[in-house]
Curated annotation (Swiss-Prot):
Gene: rplP
CDD domains (UniProt xref): Ribosomal_L16_L10e (cd01433)
Entry keyword set: Ribonucleoprotein, Ribosomal protein, RNA-binding, rRNA-binding, tRNA-binding
Comp. bias regions, Basic residues: 1-17
Designated name of the protein: Large ribosomal subunit protein uL16
Length: 139
Protein backbone atom coordinates (compact mmCIF):
# COMPACT_ATOMS: atom_id res chain seq x y z
CA UNK A 1 0.00 0.00 0.00
CA UNK A 2 1.09 3.53 -0.72
CA UNK A 3 1.31 5.69 2.42
CA UNK A 4 3.77 8.44 3.36
CA UNK A 5 6.62 7.43 5.66
CA UNK A 6 6.23 10.57 7.74
CA UNK A 7 4.21 13.76 7.53
CA UNK A 8 4.58 17.18 9.09
CA UNK A 9 1.04 17.07 10.48
CA UNK A 10 -0.94 13.95 11.34
CA UNK A 11 -4.35 15.28 10.25
CA UNK A 12 -5.31 17.72 7.48
CA UNK A 13 -8.35 19.60 6.25
CA UNK A 14 -10.42 17.96 3.55
CA UNK A 15 -9.08 18.79 0.07
CA UNK A 16 -11.15 20.92 -2.32
CA UNK A 17 -12.51 19.27 -5.46
CA UNK A 18 -12.78 22.43 -7.57
CA UNK A 19 -11.03 23.32 -10.82
CA UNK A 20 -9.12 21.35 -13.43
CA UNK A 21 -5.64 19.86 -13.08
CA UNK A 22 -2.85 22.32 -13.86
CA UNK A 23 0.00 19.80 -14.10
CA UNK A 24 0.30 16.14 -15.01
CA UNK A 25 -2.20 16.37 -17.85
CA UNK A 26 -0.02 14.83 -20.57
CA UNK A 27 1.71 11.46 -20.88
CA UNK A 28 5.29 11.84 -19.63
CA UNK A 29 6.81 8.33 -19.47
CA UNK A 30 4.78 5.69 -21.30
CA UNK A 31 2.91 5.35 -24.59
CA UNK A 32 -0.64 4.95 -23.21
CA UNK A 33 -2.42 6.30 -20.15
CA UNK A 34 -5.60 6.68 -18.10
CA UNK A 35 -6.82 10.29 -17.77
CA UNK A 36 -9.44 11.43 -15.25
CA UNK A 37 -12.54 12.98 -16.83
CA UNK A 38 -14.07 14.02 -13.51
CA UNK A 39 -12.61 14.85 -10.11
CA UNK A 40 -12.70 12.95 -6.85
CA UNK A 41 -10.62 11.04 -4.33
CA UNK A 42 -8.58 7.89 -4.90
CA UNK A 43 -7.59 5.82 -1.88
CA UNK A 44 -4.37 3.83 -1.66
CA UNK A 45 -6.38 0.60 -1.94
CA UNK A 46 -8.06 1.70 -5.18
CA UNK A 47 -4.70 2.69 -6.69
CA UNK A 48 -3.23 -0.69 -5.74
CA UNK A 49 -6.26 -2.59 -7.11
CA UNK A 50 -5.96 -0.79 -10.46
CA UNK A 51 -2.21 -1.46 -10.61
CA UNK A 52 -2.70 -5.18 -9.93
CA UNK A 53 -5.48 -5.41 -12.55
CA UNK A 54 -3.16 -3.88 -15.18
CA UNK A 55 -0.03 -5.86 -14.35
CA UNK A 56 -1.89 -9.18 -14.24
CA UNK A 57 -3.29 -8.58 -17.70
CA UNK A 58 -0.03 -7.54 -19.36
CA UNK A 59 1.79 -10.47 -17.67
CA UNK A 60 5.58 -10.04 -17.96
CA UNK A 61 5.71 -7.48 -20.76
CA UNK A 62 5.47 -3.73 -20.41
CA UNK A 63 6.05 -1.21 -17.65
CA UNK A 64 3.46 0.60 -15.52
CA UNK A 65 3.91 4.08 -14.02
CA UNK A 66 1.67 5.42 -11.22
CA UNK A 67 1.57 9.22 -11.54
CA UNK A 68 -0.41 9.92 -8.37
CA UNK A 69 0.38 9.41 -4.70
CA UNK A 70 -2.05 9.25 -1.75
CA UNK A 71 -0.42 11.89 0.45
CA UNK A 72 -3.48 13.25 2.26
CA UNK A 73 -4.99 11.67 5.39
CA UNK A 74 -8.78 11.40 5.62
CA UNK A 75 -10.21 11.01 9.11
CA UNK A 76 -13.34 9.35 10.43
CA UNK A 77 -14.94 9.20 13.85
CA UNK A 78 -16.02 5.78 15.16
CA UNK A 79 -19.64 4.66 14.78
CA UNK A 80 -22.09 5.68 17.52
CA UNK A 81 -19.76 8.33 18.92
CA UNK A 82 -21.08 11.66 20.18
CA UNK A 83 -19.97 14.78 18.36
CA UNK A 84 -17.13 16.80 19.81
CA UNK A 85 -14.05 15.50 21.61
CA UNK A 86 -11.71 16.24 18.72
CA UNK A 87 -11.15 15.16 15.17
CA UNK A 88 -11.41 11.45 14.31
CA UNK A 89 -8.49 9.13 13.65
CA UNK A 90 -6.89 8.72 10.22
CA UNK A 91 -8.89 6.12 8.29
CA UNK A 92 -7.61 6.39 4.69
CA UNK A 93 -4.83 7.97 2.68
CA UNK A 94 -6.18 9.65 -0.44
CA UNK A 95 -4.99 11.39 -3.58
CA UNK A 96 -7.08 14.40 -4.61
CA UNK A 97 -7.76 13.99 -8.36
CA UNK A 98 -8.80 16.87 -10.59
CA UNK A 99 -10.22 16.51 -14.13
CA UNK A 100 -7.54 16.09 -16.80
CA UNK A 101 -4.94 14.40 -14.59
CA UNK A 102 -3.12 11.36 -16.06
CA UNK A 103 -3.31 8.66 -13.37
CA UNK A 104 -1.45 5.68 -14.86
CA UNK A 105 0.89 5.19 -17.81
CA UNK A 106 1.87 2.05 -19.68
CA UNK A 107 4.64 1.26 -22.20
CA UNK A 108 6.16 -1.76 -23.91
CA UNK A 109 2.93 -3.39 -25.12
CA UNK A 110 0.79 -3.09 -28.26
CA UNK A 111 -2.34 -0.93 -28.25
CA UNK A 112 -5.07 -3.63 -28.05
CA UNK A 113 -3.37 -5.19 -25.00
CA UNK A 114 -2.88 -1.75 -23.43
CA UNK A 115 -6.54 -0.83 -24.02
CA UNK A 116 -7.77 -4.02 -22.34
CA UNK A 117 -5.37 -3.64 -19.39
CA UNK A 118 -6.45 -0.03 -18.90
CA UNK A 119 -10.13 -1.00 -19.20
CA UNK A 120 -9.69 -3.50 -16.37
CA UNK A 121 -7.98 -0.85 -14.25
CA UNK A 122 -10.71 1.70 -15.01
CA UNK A 123 -13.31 -0.63 -13.48
CA UNK A 124 -11.48 -0.37 -10.15
CA UNK A 125 -11.62 3.44 -10.08
CA UNK A 126 -14.55 5.43 -8.61
CA UNK A 127 -14.53 8.16 -11.30
CA UNK A 128 -14.96 8.51 -15.04
CA UNK A 129 -11.69 8.08 -16.92
CA UNK A 130 -10.58 7.74 -20.53
CA UNK A 131 -7.83 5.99 -22.46
CA UNK A 132 -5.21 8.34 -23.96
CA UNK A 133 -2.20 7.70 -26.18
CA UNK A 134 1.03 9.66 -26.63
CA UNK A 135 0.82 12.47 -29.19
CA UNK A 136 2.87 12.42 -32.42
CA UNK A 137 6.26 10.78 -32.97
CA UNK A 138 8.17 12.08 -29.92
CA UNK A 139 8.81 8.61 -28.53
Amino acid sequence: MLIPRRTKHRKQHHPRRTGAASGGTTIAFGDYGIQAVEGGYLTNRQIEAARIAMTRHIKRGGKVWINIYPDRPLTKKPAETRMGSGKGSVEWWIANIKPGRVLFELAGVDEPLAREAMRRAQHKLPMKTRFVRREGGDQ
